[in-house]
Amino acid sequence: MSAQEIIVENYMQALLKAALLPMPQEIAEFLEEEPGSLGVYIEMLRLADNVPVALDYVWYHIRFSYLLSENLESELYEIIRKRDGTQMNIAAGYLDIGLATAQEAELLKVKKGEPLLIERVNIVDNNGKPVHYGKMLIVGRRYRLYY
């Protein structure tokens, strides 16, 4: 028996938070900054046909602070490419499993403790300079990853 395929007609993202915030140590190290220095923090809820499928937490290097004056519900990589020509590449990444906290469950419209696929990815530019550190919490039963 196979799972029923769902065709998504409307994919969008909703901005939850965008700010300059002090970076935790792990993130600052990847972005080649001192812990506590400012980074561009962006939190998004990703939706498919108005159903939450993922939460995206991303820390951009401070050189991308101009993002805070852009429409963050559009494609951020496209904004960066058009603005300064930066091309992005995956430096490292991995998949893991975690359980939804109460806050995550509320945003994703799942039960607290539901298993979530966690995708962590570090992105660099063509010169190897760090662009962003990302963590996405994915509702596996509502999402398909393509490789």
Q: Over which residues does each language-model region extend?
A:
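C-terminal all-alpha effector/ligand-binding and dimerization domain
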Residues: 9-147
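Short linear motifs at protein or domain termini
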Residues: 1-8
